[in-house]
Regions:
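Flexible helical/loop "lid" subdomain adjacent to adenine-nucleotide binding pockets
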Residues: 43, 153-156, 160-182, 190, ...
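ATP-dependent adenylation/nucleotidyltransferase module used to activate substrates
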Residues: 2-153, 157, 161-164, 169, ...
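Nucleotide-activated sugar donor-binding and catalytic core shared by glycosyltransferases
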Residues: 185
Length: 253
């Protein structure tokens, strides 16, 4: 029976494959380079949609505990709702993973209606729910699963849409909410996460949003793919340029 349960619940943990070691090395480097885990941090909240990115983040952070880092508590926060980014994921699936890891799971309900759907306002609503839930358990550090490719998209999207040269920042102090956002996957490319998730059996399609499939971010991703036909390293270069030269205006919103 235990073997059957283990097969049904994908858990990624050391000892790692070569790819797992590479991802852990990248996340450690990001933590050290950007001071993501401040001294004395006791609790971290992970925004957990249940997709490959947030689960990879959860597994890697959980594996770091006690291995060069304190045994900090991890609280997973899942926003559920008809059109939320985690809508395609079974609640039982997420609960089972968190139970196996010994991670506290908090589920928040989004009340977004189809006629109200718009990516920016939806994102703000989900973040508000995550931040409030994090503070309720005493976690003032909130980790998001944004990776290198997300940062490249954000840079180009901001440049084209707002004439701003700004990518995702590794660390953002949200003064309005009294929490700090961290992005430990900032150095990791999406393809590596996809391979990691496939190896451990949690690569699942999750987005159920009827708006998201036609969003500006999707359009920017198509532009980047077209650029890659002529400039193979453009994705990594965009993300790197964002870290080196991007605006820090969003660092303390």
């Amino acid at each position: 029976m235990a073997q059957l349960t283990e097969l049904l619940i994908p858990i990624a943990k050391p000892p790692w494959t070569a790819l797992g070691r590479e991802l852990e090395s990248c996340i450690r480097k990001a933590i050290y380079d950007f001071g993501l885990l401040e001294e004395g941090v006791e609790r971290i909240a992970v925004a957990l949609s249940g997709g490959k990115d947030s689960l990879t983040l959860l597994f890697l952070l959980h594996a770091l505990r006690g291995r060069g880092f304190p045994l900090f508590e991890i609280h997973a926060i899942h926003v559920d709702g008809e059109f939320s980014c985690g809508a395609g994921i079974s609640g039982g699936f997420i609960r089972s993973i968190c139970r196996e890891l010994g991670v506290n799971l908090i589920t928040c309900q989004s009340t977004q209606k189809r006629e109200q759907l718009e990516c920016y306002s939806c994102s703000r609503e989900r973040r508000r729910l995550v931040f409030n839930a994090a503070k309720e358990v005493g976690a003032t550090t909130v980790a998001f699963g944004h990776h290198r490719d997300d940062s490249a998209q954000t840079l180009l999207l901001n440049l084209l849409h707002k004439a701003e040269f700004a990518a995702n920042l590794p660390k953002v102090h949200m003064r309005e909410y009294g929490v700090t956002i961290i992005r430990p996957l900032i150095y990791i490319e999406e393809e590596s996460i996809r391979s990691f998730a496939k190896h451990y059996g949690f690569a699942r399609i999750t987005c159920q949003c009827p708006v998201g499939q036609n969003s500006k971010r999707k359009a920017v991703e198509q532009i980047i793919r077209q650029m890659e036909e002529h400039f193979p390293y453009v994705r990594g270069n965009l993300a790197k340029a964002g870290l080196l030269y991007g605006s820090n205006k969003a660092a303390t919103p």
